[in-house]
Structures are given as C-alpha cells and as structure tokens.
C-alpha cells in the first residue's frame, strides 16, 4: 500500500510517498481503507518538532521529544484523524463490519496518511454520519474532542452565555455547535 512517510524532522520536504506493508488487524481491531484525512497542527508539530512550534513550557519539551523520538521520529506516518470504510474486522470485533463507513481519531499514534490503517474497536472510532461526506467527517474528531473538554472545564450550564474566541477554526466551530445544541447555551462567536 502507499503511505506518506517521513524519517527525519523538518519542513514538508521531508515527506515522501512510499510503498509500505499493508497492516493486518488483530482480533480486536478493524482494518479501515482511508478515504480522507486532514492535515492539522498535530501533523505540523510532529513533522517539524521545532521547540518554537510548541505551545508548552520548555520543561515539557524534553518528555515530548523522548516520546516522539529524539533524533528521528518513532512514528513515520502522520495523520491523526480519518474517515474511511471498514475492509476487515478481527474475530472479536462486534461493533463494526466490513462495508461500514467510519471516522476516527488516532491521537499520538497517527498513521492515517496511508491507504489502510488498523484501529482498535474500543478506540475513538464511530460510524460516520450518513449526511456527511468522508472529507467532512475526517475533520471532526480533533476539534470536537478539544471543544468538549474545554466546555466541560467551563462547567457550562443551560441558558448561560458563552463567548467562543476563534469560532471559525476547527475547535471553535465545534465549541459553538456543542455549546448551543448540547449544553443549551447562548453563544456568541468571534474570530479574526
């Protein structure tokens, strides 16, 4: 199968198209054929890994670098979100079957910039809403996960007013939708 790989940190020039082995799902995994995957800040950070890219204290840079790889990346296929179709399911998988359209968030494991990927059934994977295309569904997981965690920290209650700064971005757009439709808040969004 084809995948976009990188073996060193740097600019987009370190990315290249390569043939890699097609994964085989374990008993608790699905094999998904990737139809769409976005490029986001996590991909940029993992590929470039410059300290200036991190929005964190310098002391956290060291453990992050050890986690991702000191001299070269430990994970060499980027892509933290995807939408695609289940091609095969491990023998203990019960929630998904071949042919199901799914979307998923892979987190630091990444790997979605490939034709196929294995995802644990109990991972952050769900049936893709029928009214969304693959490209639309692939962009949802990261923004929704971040937005819901921020709204929970805010202890938002029905009827409360909330201002969402950056309402046109991936996280902000999801925060607006979740605050209004899930929490019942009065939402004002700003961007610029």
Which residues are covered by each model-predicted region?
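Extracytoplasmic/periplasmic beta-strand context in beta-sandwich domains
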Residues: 18, 100, 114-115, 136, ...
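A structural motif shared across PLP-dependent enzymes of the aminotransferase-like
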Residues: 53, 108-121
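Glycine/charged-rich beta-loop-alpha catalytic/anionic-binding loops adjacent to active sites
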Residues: 123-134, 158-160
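Mid-domain Rossmann-like dinucleotide-binding core that forms the NAD(H)/NADP(H) cofactor-binding site
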Residues: 137-192
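Residues located in well-ordered beta-strands
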Residues: 2, 16-21, 33, 84-85, ...
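Glycine-rich beta-strand-centered segment in the early N-terminal region that forms part
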Residues: 23-38, 50-108
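Cytochrome P450 core scaffold surrounding the K-helix E-X-X-R motif
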Residues: 42-47
């Amino acid at each position: 199968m084809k995948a976009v790989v990188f073996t060193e940190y740097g600019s987009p020039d370190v990315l290249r198209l390569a043939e890699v082995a097609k994964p085989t799902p374990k008993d608790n995994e699905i094999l998904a054929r990737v139809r769409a995957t976005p490029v986001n800040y996590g991909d940029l950070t993992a590929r470039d890994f410059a300290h200036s890219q991190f929005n964190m204290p310098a002391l956290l840079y060291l453990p992050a670098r050890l986690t991702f790889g000191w001299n070269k990346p430990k994970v060499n296929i980027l892509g933290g979100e995807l939408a695609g179709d289940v091609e095969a399911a491990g023998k203990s998988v019960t929630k998904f079957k071949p042919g199901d359209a799914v979307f998923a968030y892979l987190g630091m494991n990444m790997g979605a910039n490939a034709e196929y990927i294995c995802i644990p059934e109990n991972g952050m994977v769900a049936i893709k809403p029928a009214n969304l295309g693959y490209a639309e569904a692939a962009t949802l997981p990261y923004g929704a996960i971040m937005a819901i965690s921020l709204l929970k920290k805010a202890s938002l209650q029905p009827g409360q007013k909330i201002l969402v700064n950056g309402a046109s971005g991936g996280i902000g757009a999801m925060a607006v939708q979740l605050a209004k439709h899930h929490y019942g808040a009065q939402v004002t969004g700003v961007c610029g």
